[in-house]
């Protein structure tokens, strides 16, 4: 059963701040784990993806430290089947190491998180804050909270603001579409063909990096419904909700092809969804094209 937010706004805000600061403080250890735990773990996550040792180590680090915060009642992760609970008030859902398949070629990876007022699985409108970390040439963090989005540079477990008002640029420049082209539906392929002639391809295999391209340059990111997988690939709770919260807070839109991703109330913790995120007009056209 979900635990409701039964605390004052001040207490909730303090806990949200503690969660964000704890994630910031953990990032140096996650970067070390990426270097030290590059091998396979011979296990799979609840949705069948192969897990690297780095996936498990990042999950372990965040679980220990986030659940150590007095105000946190539960921790849910893409890497574990069930929610881990304790006494507290707010609820954290994470993709501890997004894009870990990029580890072998040493490409972009990151961490995605959402802070909820209700225990997952829950609707996206229960988010109080969401964000992601990119472990790139520099470590950066984007956080959506209280209707605005900020970008930080992370150094030695601390953060400094580099942009206190991140907004999606009005003139879109880039696009990135996941899933095998041969598996795209005819409707989505028609839309994608039009977009290819308007925008530049930017797709790196890590959602954090691809979404940051949209935040930086404007455009659209999608992992669509496929003929072979109409339910989509990405997880509502761990990827869809947090990224939708960020994009919508930055003036963009999110959609599952019909409604805002934030309106989805998953029945299962690891439920998947088609996912479309970007500039308003591009999402409007997408919905009209696949309707």
Swiss-Prot record:
Mg(2+) 2 binds at residues 95, 98, 239. Pathway: Carbohydrate biosynthesis; gluconeogenesis. Substrate binds at residues 98-101, 203, 233. Pfam families: FBPase, FBPase_C. Signal peptide: none annotated. InterPro entries: FBPase_C_dom (IPR044015), FBPase_class-1 (IPR000146), FBPase_N (IPR033391), FBPtase (IPR028343). Its cofactor is Mg(2+). It catalyses: beta-D-fructose 1,6-bisphosphate + H2O = beta-D-fructose 6-phosphate + phosphate. Keywords: Carbohydrate metabolism, Cytoplasm, Hydrolase, Magnesium, Metal-binding. Belongs to the FBPase class 1 family. This is Fructose-1,6-bisphosphatase class 1 1. It comes from Haloarcula marismortui (strain ATCC 43049 / DSM 3752 / JCM 8966 / VKM B-1809) (Halobacterium marismortui). The lineage of its organism: Archaea, Methanobacteriati, Methanobacteriota, Stenosarchaea group, Halobacteria.
């Amino acid at each position: 059963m979900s635990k409701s937010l039964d605390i004052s706004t001040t207490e909730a805000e303090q806990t949200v701040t503690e969660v964000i600061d704890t994630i910031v403080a953990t990032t140096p250890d996650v970067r070390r784990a990426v270097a030290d735990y590059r091998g396979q773990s011979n296990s799979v996550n609840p949705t069948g993806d192969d897990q690297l040792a780095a996936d498990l180590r990042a999950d372990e680090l965040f679980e220990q430290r986030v659940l150590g915060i007095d105000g946190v009642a539960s921790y849910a992760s893409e890497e574990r089947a069930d929610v881990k609970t304790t006494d507290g008030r707010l609820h954290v859902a994470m993709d501890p190491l997004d894009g870990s398949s990029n580890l072998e070629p040493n490409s972009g990876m990151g961490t995605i998180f959402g802070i909820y007022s209700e225990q997952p699985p829950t609707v996206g409108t229960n988010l109080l804050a969401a964000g992601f970390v990119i472990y790139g040439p520099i470590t950066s963090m984007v956080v959506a909270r209280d209707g605005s989005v900020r970008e930080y540079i992370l150094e030695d477990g601390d953060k400094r603001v580099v942009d206190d008002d991140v907004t999606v640029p009005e003139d879109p420049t880039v696009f990135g579409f996941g899933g095998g082209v041969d598996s795209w539906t005819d409707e989505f392929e028609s839309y994608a063909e039009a977009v290819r002639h308007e925008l530049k391809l930017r797709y790196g295999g890590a959602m954090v990096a691809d979404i940051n391209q949209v935040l930086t340059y404007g455009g659209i990111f999608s992992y669509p419904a496929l003929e072979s997988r109409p339910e989509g690939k990405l997880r509502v709770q761990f990827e869809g909700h947090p990224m939708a919260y960020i994009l919508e807070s930055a003036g963009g839109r999110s959609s599952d092809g019909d409604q805002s991703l934030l309106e989805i109330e998953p029945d299962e913790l690891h439920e998947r969804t088609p996912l479309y995120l970007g500039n308003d007009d591009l999402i409007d056209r997408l919905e009209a094209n696949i309707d």
